From Swiss-Prot:
It comes from Macrovipera lebetinus (Levantine viper). It is found in: Secreted. Shows greater sequence similarity to the alpha than beta subunits compared to other heterodimer snaclecs. Keywords: Disulfide bond, Hemostasis impairing toxin, Secreted, Signal, Toxin. This is Snaclec A2. The keyword Iron-sulfur does not apply. The keyword Repeat does not apply. SMART domains: CLECT (SM00034). Heterodimer; disulfide-linked.
Amino acid sequence: MGRLISVSFGLLVVFLSLSGTGADQDCLPGWSSHEGHCYKVFNLDKTWEDAEKFCTEQANSGHLVSIDSKKEANFVAELVSQNIKETRRTDFVWIGLRAEDKRQHCSSEWSDGSSINYQNWIEAESKKCLGLEKQTRYRKWVNLNCGQPYRFTCEI
């Protein structure tokens, strides 16, 4: 009886260690998991508005990516670098931040409604939408014309 309990306990430990946290299982096929969120780079050229709309159609809580820490910024940069297909339009990738008023100031939140807790600007210009720039290995944010079509990353 003692041996059966020992074997059962051993199998339980193995099962739990193999199952992990389950974070990867929560993501849709083709999406990448990072700290409880799922991300996917789309090799489609869309304006900022159309990219945001596309992301919201992927899942209930989908939006253009919001970057809340240097760790997340590095994860997103690597994901974009590994998944972007090279074309003329790959110099920039949309993120979920844009100016919301006529003075071109950024809103106080990302397109998903979360607060801006981390910033990594290259420069301030008079354009309204923000993206990641290839020249910085997709690690810096740059102001872009919202009507230009670029690739994008969604987060759910």
